[in-house]
Amino acid sequence: MGTILDKIVDQKKKEVAALYETYTPVKEKRKTRSLVKALEQFTVIAEVKRASPSKGDINLHVDVRKQVKTYEECGAGAVSVLTDGQFFKGSFYDLQTAREESSIPLLCKDFIIDKIQIDRAYEAGADIILLIVAALTKEKLKELYSYVLEKGLEAIVEVHDEQELEIAIQLNPHVIGINNRNLKTFEVDLSQTEKLGKRLNEEKLLWISESGVHSKEDMIRVKRAGAKGVLVGEALMTSSSIHTFFEDCKVNI
């Protein structure tokens, strides 16, 4: 029996095959916004996340326009949008809607395994593409990262353990994302940020922490570890006061 990640990647292969049948990438170039610039100060990347394999439905009927507008008003430095439909109940339409509403950098959060998905994300308005080391061979990761650069976009290269980190460092990417969630089991351990962050600080690389940040105390932990930003989804999608969450993010360490 495969892991959750294996199931997701199998589904992506089907989606990619369908895209090649139904989608023709546009050639026009457009203006993009920089996450690297946003990370010059500690930044919250606020996520639109309707559901997940581990939690089921989180906020299925969220008004994407309203959510994104609130994020921007509260001080988010970037917005992340889940575009996976099968497991996270997102869509490229959600990404496009966010782009229409937002003037800050926009991350396409998906399991990218092929260039055509990057083309689709670009057309929908993404500025940043997530590339997950655990979902790709070294060769494919390098190929997709090069394509991101060719499109004039930025990448977050996501890692969960030391082995994946070594692969990511070789690319010298724009941003490395430490995912505190193990994509094989979907369990979360915030100490991954502290463990892997030490190496990234030594390498003087730009990095963020992803998943598992729910409180002021969690925010202090990731800031102390040296993260330049944090990606927050579930905590914001279920929050009764997004404004209060952002105020808590302003803690000094």
UniProtKB/Swiss-Prot annotation:
EC number: 4.1.1.48
Superkingdom of source: Bacteria
Catalysis: reaction(s): 1-(2-carboxyphenylamino)-1-deoxy-D-ribulose 5-phosphate + H(+) = (1S,2R)-1-C-(indol-3-yl)glycerol 3-phosphate + CO2 + H2O
Keyword Cytoplasm: no
SUPFAM superfamilies according to UniProt: Ribulose-phoshate binding barrel
Keywords of the record: Amino-acid biosynthesis, Aromatic amino acid biosynthesis, Decarboxylase, Lyase, Tryptophan biosynthesis
Molecular function per GO: indole-3-glycerol-phosphate synthase activity; phosphoribosylanthranilate isomerase activity
One Pfam family here: IGPS
GO terms for biological process, alphabetical: L-tryptophan biosynthetic process
Pathway(s) where this gene product acts: Amino-acid biosynthesis; L-tryptophan biosynthesis; L-tryptophan from chorismate: step 4/5
HAMAP family membership: IGPS_B
Family: Belongs to the TrpC family.
Protein name, UniProt field: Indole-3-glycerol phosphate synthase
Protein species of origin: Bacillus cereus (strain ZK / E33L)
